[in-house]
Design a protein with these regions (language model features):
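Conserved beta-strand core positions
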Residues: 5, 34, 68-70
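C-terminal structural segments of small proteins and small subunits
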Residues: 48-84
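Short, compositionally biased "basic patch" segments
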Residues: 1-2, 73
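Amphipathic, hydrophobic secondary-structure cores in small proteins
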Residues: 9-61
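Right-handed parallel beta-helix/beta-solenoid
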Residues: 2-8
């Protein structure tokens, strides 16, 4: 069973959703998932950009009410990627 951690960033504005998502991704293990809930419209750009930088994968993006829910799979550890 895959572990999913939920990060509720509702009400936070740029750049906080991306910064908090990066920090949370650093705390979970490869293979685990992070569910990010946010209402900042810029998160639609910032979160996918962040995930591209970290080498992780967005499994899904859904609209819920006035916000977005990202489901992100942790793929590699940031420190490992820096050495490549």
């Amino acid at each position: 069973m895959t572990t999913t951690t939920t990060l509720d960033l509702t009400g936070l504005k740029c750049p906080l959703p991306a910064l908090k998502t990066r920090k949370a991704l650093g705390r979970i293990k490869p293979g685990e998932r992070l569910e990010v809930r946010c209402t900042d419209p810029l998160a639609a750009i910032d979160i996918p950009h962040l995930v591209g930088e970290t080498g992780d994968r967005i499994e899904s993006v859904t609209r819920e009410g006035d916000g977005l829910v990202f489901l992100i799979e942790r793929r590699i550890v940031l420190e490992d990627r820096q050495g490549q």
